């Protein structure tokens, strides 16, 4: 049994693919106690936080390129009692996330 499941959620806007939503996460949560890291590869991650929290996510990873105020989003994720991860596209400088590393 896996200790960790990484779930890529794509919206066909931020990235050119479309994948699963909260209903699928909820369905697999019903049969698994494994840690779920939900990677929001979406244009507006804030819009999906509550749905994935209710579906059973343990952590949310968002892309730094999708938010104007990463600190606020980090606080919102933490307020849902979820762990936080930050991701970036290959062309995005690593320095974009360094100011937030002490918050995650």
Give short role names for the model-derived ranges.
Residues 3-5, 58:
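Short acidic/polar active-site loop segments enriched in Thr and Asp
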Residues 5-22, 64:
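Glycine-rich, proline-tolerant flexible connector loops at the mouths of alpha/beta enzymes
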Residues 7, 38-40, 62, 86:
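Conserved hydrophobic beta-strand within the GNAT/NAT acetyltransferase core sheet
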Residues 13, 35, 47:
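Active-site acidic carboxylates
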Residues 27-35:
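Short, structured active-site "lid" loops
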Residues 31, 47-48, 57-104:
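Conserved anion-binding
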